[in-house]
Amino acid sequence: MPGITISKKDFLNSIHQKLSDDEIEKILFSLGIEMDIICEDTGVVVYKLDIAANRYDLLCLEGLAKIINTYLHGSSIISKPIIRKSSIKVIQESVSKRPFIACGIIRNARFNYKHFIEYQDKLHQTIGRNRSAVAIGTHDLDKFYNGKPIKYKTIKLNKLCFQPLNISTEIKGTELKTKLGCHLHQYIDLLGSDEEGIIFEYDNHIISMPPIINSEFSKIEPSTTNIFIEVTGTDYNKVDQVLKLMLLNFNTGIIEQVEIQKENSIDITPVFNVTPYVFTIDEICKKIGFLLQPDTIKLCLEKMQYAVEIKNDQLIAIPSYNRLDIIDKCDIIEDILIGYGFENIPLDNPIEFYTIGKENDLNKFSDKIREEMAMMGFNEMLTLTLLNKTENIMHDYMVEVEYPKSKEYEVVRTSLLPGLFKTLSINQNVKLPIQLFEISDVVLLDSYNKSFNKRFLTGVCAQMNSKLEEILEVIISLFKKLNLIVEFTNIITDSDNIFLKEKWEKYFIKNQTASIYVSSYNIPRTLIGCLGVVHPTINMQFKISLPISAFEIDLEKVFVLIKNII
């Protein structure tokens, strides 16, 4: 959860209330905001707050004060922003690196300069992903604008020369890394090129170079009254949302939309469209689990920054422009309950019968196996479910993540062994032998390409001369506790073991691997897994210098076999 630090004095002034710390904490908690700590910072009492990850509008005092004032006073405090179209135009040329832009203007602004800059930084860190997804530039419009259009374009760095923010002299584009502070170097790398940069230009003056820095030429100051805000990025929705947040939270006058002229289209930014949500009163009462009168529902929503209209049995709820966290009807139902107060919900039993919960049988069985493995000297691991595709060498068919955030998390694992190998790789300096195990789910695909979970038990043993015997003893001992007879068969001659044939060829040394079968007086001979000495190519891939013996067992299949006789 992102956090903010605000002055207690400023906070109380902004909500026009004299409240105790306990009263403030209770109000904040009702809105899903956690008071982390109350402390002094350079002689000033401050609140450190944890904000919900989807409430970017609350990451500054101004946004926080708006929701609390509305929560305390309802619709009487809501003021709709004055929005009009500006005569200012931005011409967007072909820009491939950060193709999406949105611009807007705050006229007659009266704002806290320190809060404004802090909020810009918070948006950069959160929704902006450290400026990789979104970067914000803010400018004093009166310092540079005289009627000509602003240009957004790509420029060769060797042709670039401008005076960056808070730097006394002009610098060349090729001097960015040497002349700018170290804290800006990470943003220079976001350009993706040592030869080209992106700029906003006005009348041959550079006003900003996103996502790195603005220019001294258009620097905003505490006395600035007309603020031009430009937002660039790789995702249009985020770019538009960030611009609206900056405009709405610090709007004390008029908001102006700016025309963006592209090669084949014209956009007006930001886009101030909101979706009205239509409910029946019965639908709302059914969802929340108790009866509420229409007027009460209306009041609850107005406390949460909605415009509400009731027509016959229908309720129409329109979120305010800054409620970007509203995605579906369920969010509005939640806001009704927040506005009503969870502490006010009646404690009646909503059902007429009672049930007894119990632990899932497979999980209970898994815990018993964990205890047995631990008593045999193995340390339990809990590794990541997502892997790099090259690490998941067990199968060619696997569930892939459609839009992975990183190459490290491209596919869902089909085996627990890669995770244990990665753990071994970074823990080779500990005392030998290193014995690790994991009991977790993997995700496999059936013949219809449908995914399903399987519970596996996997173990590895690494020491100077790992042998099959070490793993054999562990497996025999484990299944002896389950009253099952274990049999080991050479995989090469095991015609039934198609799944494991694919596995051993990639993981284990020939003639140092085996299939694992179990049976009992009322359980037929059943294949449950495999074991072997790990192939040196695997050691090389995961950079493990020690020999490894390993096993993998379909624990879910074992559970199905024995659950009827337990």
Swiss-Prot record:
Cofactor: Mg(2+)
Signal peptide region: none
Keywords assigned: Aminoacyl-tRNA synthetase, ATP-binding, Cytoplasm, Ligase, Magnesium, Metal-binding, Nucleotide-binding, Protein biosynthesis
Positions of Mg(2+) binding: 325, 331, 334-335
Keyword Transferase appears in the UniProt entry: no
GO terms of biological process kind: phenylalanyl-tRNA aminoacylation
Record-level Gene Ontology MF annotations: ATP binding; magnesium ion binding; phenylalanine-tRNA ligase activity; sequence-specific mRNA binding
GO cellular component: phenylalanine-tRNA ligase complex
Subcellular location: Cytoplasm
Keyword Acetylation: no
Family: Belongs to the phenylalanyl-tRNA synthetase beta subunit family. Type 2 subfamily.
Record note on quaternary structure: Tetramer of two alpha and two beta subunits.
Protein name: Probable phenylalanine--tRNA ligase beta subunit
